[in-house]
């Protein structure tokens, strides 16, 4: 790149900023997906432990680090949110299967989003390299003009 075009530098900078924003959004998405996966795993562990617990007593968090010891009336059935704030009653074993399927879907989604993040990072690196070359060209052109005056 002999002569650096200011418009090209500006365009590259704009692309780099956009890629950075997209990477940030996708990274946040990955965090939310991971949080949902962890919640699903915890729910499965809780349901399994409840099936093994003879007296049906559990600790119910009520906030502020406080818990109530409560008895579960029907450990054989669970209300499961299936989306759009709709919950359905399922047998505990069916609920566990549903949650396991949801976790599998979340893991596949996380893998897809992580791949997109990796691809965007590669593109951002390439743009950053081109931008650095354009800046170098601009400095060299400026140094050449300054020496000829």
From Swiss-Prot:
SUPFAM superfamilies: Prefoldin
Pfam families for the chain: Prefoldin (PF02996)
Superkingdom of source: Archaea
CDD domains to which the protein is assigned, alphabetical: Prefoldin_alpha_GimC
Alphabetical GO biological process terms: protein folding
Keywords in alphabetical order: Chaperone, Cytoplasm
UniProt keyword Cytoplasm present: yes
Coiled coil ranges: none
Gene3D superfamilies xrefs: 1.10.287.370
Subcellular location: Cytoplasm
Listed GO MF terms: unfolded protein binding
Any one Gene Ontology cellular component term annotated for this protein: cytoplasm
Complex and partners: Heterohexamer of two alpha and four beta subunits.
Record function comment: Molecular chaperone capable of stabilizing a range of proteins. Seems to fulfill an ATP-independent, HSP70-like function in archaeal de novo protein folding.
Cited NCBIfam families: prefoldin subunit alpha
Protein family membership: Belongs to the prefoldin alpha subunit family.
Protein name: Prefoldin subunit alpha
